[in-house]
Amino acid sequence: MAPGIPKPRHQRLVLQCYPDGQAADKKPNPSELSYLLFYVNHRRVKLEKVGPFLENKCYKDVSRGRQGNVMVALDIFAKLIEECHEDLNLFAQNVVNTLLDVVNSGDLLLCQHSNKVFALFCQYHDGGLFLGDPEFVRSFKQLLEVYVNMAKVPNGPNSVQWKIVGLEAAKSIAGSAAIATQTGSTSISPIVHLLLSSLQESQSDLEQLDHSLDLGGGLPDNIGGSKRNSMHQDAIDNFIHEESPEKQVRYLSFHALRTFFDTTSVVQIQSATRAIVTYIINSNVPEHWATSLVVIVAKWAPVQYRFVILVSLVEMLVAMSPNNVKSELVVAALIHALLSSTVNMVGLSVMDILGSLLNKQAAIIKHAQSNNEASGAFEELIDKLSACMISLGTHIYYADQISDMVGEVLWRCTDPATAGQTGHAVSADDGTGLQIKRPTRRVFTTLSANNAELQHSSDESVGAATGGTANGSAGVGSFSHDNSPDVLIRRLAIVEGFFRLQNEEQDMTAHNSVPLSAWDGTQYLLNHDSAIVKEAYVFCFVAFLEYEFGNPDRFQIGFGRRGYNQNVAYGFVSHLSMQLNKLITNTRATNGDFLLGNSLLQNIVIRLQQDGVVATFPHMLKAHELGRALVTGQSSESNTLAQGIIIEDIFTLYLKQVGDVSDAADLTVQAGDEVALRKKLGLWPNYLDWPVSSSSRIQDADAQIDTSMVAKMKTLSRSEVEGLFAEYVTSMPQETRAELFSDYDDVMTIHSRQQVPDENLIVGKARSLKQLNAGSILERQTMRDGWLGDDVKNNKFAEERKGFTPTVSDLKGAMGGNAYVSKEPIAQKFDPQTFLNTWTVTDNLGGLTV
């Protein structure tokens, strides 16, 4: 400006803030600075002039090496930001340009002084300029890049101090609203990589660092609210700056990383999570360190946003190519660590996560089969995914969750030809305490569509960052109905894992029961072509029986006036019993088939008691007639004599079990004596005495049958069996015994029509004796053909209520639901990974012949 021409007032006010002299540690004149702040506070429009003037003066001072004046300019900017932060966008570009000039100067003292201005700028900037000012975005990202590069200075003079400057800036930007925008989030990855690199280089113990910061930021309990949060941050900052420079590097890195996750911005949490995963994949990070890191950062996030971390991990895993096994293993390990932890993830869509992992596992198995890649890495990845899904059972957020998870996996195991008619989800009490569920395929289809859109809109850079593709497998929530043996075996093991895991829970009554109807459509697996699938299916169903009927606190006996529950006896268990009959009477039945069939039969009777007897007896009686005909030489079937002997052995053991559950001690003794005799004669395969579980050696099953002694074997005719029941099983109502010995084809006609309807059922509960007597027991809201058969449906319930006078015990049963008691012990402590490591099935079971 020419001499003699007066300067504008805003320039004079700014210049008056500069003290005289050439000192390196100048500070603004306090009174003049106060007047400048008063001036701009009352005339905010002047900020548009003060900002550029201060920027230009600072640029000249930097170029001329006037360190003291630069510090004054930085202090003035700091005060302007504090006092006029509502209008920060008016001079935000000037602040960023000034900081760029300062950090590019290479002066350590000036760069350290710039940290305060940058921290205030990040604290008060609302991110608005990131939405419509590309020049500002470019400058700001350039500034961030310079700060990040400061922290990467190689070892040398003042390298630790330079690193602290960069880490201080990283901590500041981590808490900024600017980084939480879609545009600003692109800068998260390099900053997070810097922080993790710093932590890994120092070989930091993450849990110890977290604990130390918490102690350093501790406050008295009488301080609360936003004041407490602000004081907590100040206390942590003071704690960090009191440490040695080397410790400051570790604490600053850790605190900055914590700040990235201590936010309500979904975009920021998601971007930071992906950055962590990318770093772990591309760096040689120990697995324990990586898994600990993921669990710790999840605890930092607000509880209602923690699920974003898990969803981000699953999305990255789904997007990876099946060829990228190493990276998939890393992400799967992180998912498993998070699901195995005690981190509470409110709002987590468990079913979508389960569906995504099921699809991914099926895709990996299919890829391995098609490319003949049965490597240990693939097996490890498949096992890890199974462990992830089982661990989902430790995060229970609603009463029907276990039921829904089991139903979802079992639905994927049903025959694809009939899967459209099999559904699950909406619950209705069937009077057993187990719930009948109405099909909800449309609900899951809707969820699939919604999540397909979510998956499509996810960041496409994930695949590139992790060396994968976006179409690695089915998207989140979509269905995969692959019924190959390997897939079926894995899925059945997952369901078994759910039950084993839940058996260790102390308060299982907090979870609703898994309905028997969830198994509808899976009974064909008992006669699957693969012996391993059959084995896995039996293990799985036995685990279900132990879970639902193995805890005395969970269920109580209540069979009603007919001595059994029709929904159990004439429902899925009856259909399963048909398949059991087919399994043991098949001409190609092996020792493994007999072992599995006998184990399944024994568990059904032990757990379901009278209901199990009613459901299985017609089918076992039919099998007994075949076995007796084979033993006596009166059969035209092509089964062998040894098979007939084993069928008879199974039936005799079955009668012994019926005696046990029916309090018919004489029947138990008589059947037990026959068992002892057959063992003595060599007419008893030793494997019928084996307990069967997923750790059994099924392939060791062998039958040393001495067929020459068959003449000494005692067999019972149909009438003799009926006589035994009439004489000994007196606890069973006469009309029920009559049903058991009805013509087999007539019984099957009723059983085959007994299907779960699509309509809702009125819950079979009552709150008073009057209500119970009025007929609230298991009435249907609507009726349709095929429920019980045209000739039965109209009078079935009327017949049951005829002459029925409810008692207090009946009311208790109606209020609580009928159920069962077992004296079997609950499973010991269960670990999903250990279970999967020891869970083995054999591939030569089908080769064992009699």
From Swiss-Prot:
One Pfam family from the record: EFR3
The organism's place on the tree of life at top rank: Eukaryota
InterPro entries recorded: ARM-type_fold (IPR016024), EFR3 (IPR039786), EFR3_HEAT-like_rpt (IPR049150)
GO biological process, one term: protein localization to plasma membrane
Any one GO CC term of the record: plasma membrane
Family, as annotated: Belongs to the EFR3 family.
Name of the featured protein: Protein EFR3
Native source species: Yarrowia lipolytica (strain CLIB 122 / E 150)
